[in-house]
Amino acid sequence: MDHRLLEIIACPVCNGKLYYSQDKQELICKLDNLAFPLRDGIPVLLETEARSLAAEESRP
């Protein structure tokens, strides 16, 4: 995941900061407890594609 891209993209739901989870290949929004998938290295920032996170998954 390109760190420059992480600096400019935001959660499509709340416009909050997204964090990259390398082990799960997801972008995490800690404010909404959502995980957005990466497909072929491309972030899929659609709310309908996001999965809800359990409380312990969204902690830093």
UniProtKB/Swiss-Prot annotation:
It comes from the Bacteria. One of its GO terms (cellular component) is cytosol. NCBIfam families: PRK11827.1. Belongs to the UPF0434 family. This is UPF0434 protein Ent638_1436. It comes from Enterobacter sp. (strain 638).
